[in-house]
A protein has these predicted regions:
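A short alpha-helix capping/helix-coil boundary motif
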Residues: 2-5, 40-41, 64-68
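General secondary-structure edge motif
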Residues: 8-9, 33, 40, 70
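Histidine/lysine/aspartate-rich catalytic loop segments that bind and position anionic ligands
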Residues: 20-51
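Extended, charge-rich helix/loop segments that form flexible
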Residues: 1-31, 152-156
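Residue-level signal for pocket-adjacent positions within structured domains
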Residues: 15, 40, 109
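C-terminal active-site subregion of NodB/CE4 polysaccharide deacetylases
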Residues: 30, 47-156
Length: 156
């Protein structure tokens, strides 16, 4: 079972040229993937007003649900960044699971602050630009965790 988080505002291909299209998402959904949200316009929640955060969360959720016909309960925080306010907003808007690259987990909302491994294109390549199973293995086994640090102070 795989979960895929995405931004719902996919019609703007000039801003997000590598985004999946709705037909791609619908095909993935039919193939059994669980589709989750990643905001509507790729904002960083901690940098926005509560009004904007709610609008982004609700808008993304609604758009994906309309296209897939399935409730959206998964959310991936952009860059893994969140504040207690953002966690409360996720809960308020009906999400049940929130994924972050930050190792901090809110003990009051453990399912809304689930740590995940952050990998991006090029994150597991060697000095010559080739895929490196050794680097990937180190990342997966937490032996080389440069992407697992979080400078944000979380107050719970």
């Amino acid at each position: 079972e795989r979960i895929f988080g995405l931004m719902a505002d996919l019609d703007d291909s000039s801003r997000f040229p590598l985004s999946l299209t709705w037909p791609m998402i619908e095909e993935m959904h039919r193939a059994g993937m669980i589709i989750g949200s990643h905001t509507r316009t790729h904002i960083s929640l901690p940098a926005e007003s509560m009004e904007t955060v709610i609008k982004e969360l609700e808008g993304s959720k609604r758009a994906i649900e309309e296209r897939t016909g399935t409730p959206v309960v998964h959310f991936a925080y952009r860059g893994g960044q969140f504040t207690p306010r953002d966690v409360a907003a996720l809960e308020r808007t009906g999400y049940r699971f929130g994924y972050t690259a930050c190792p901090h987990q809110d003990p009051q909302h453990p399912t809304l602050t689930i740590e995940r491994l952050l990998l991006w294109e090029g994150s597991s390549v060697d000095g010559d630009g080739r895929f490196s199973p050794a680097i990937l293995s180190c990342q997966i086994n937490d032996l080389w965790p440069p992407a697992r640090t979080c400078a944000r102070v979380h107050h719970v």
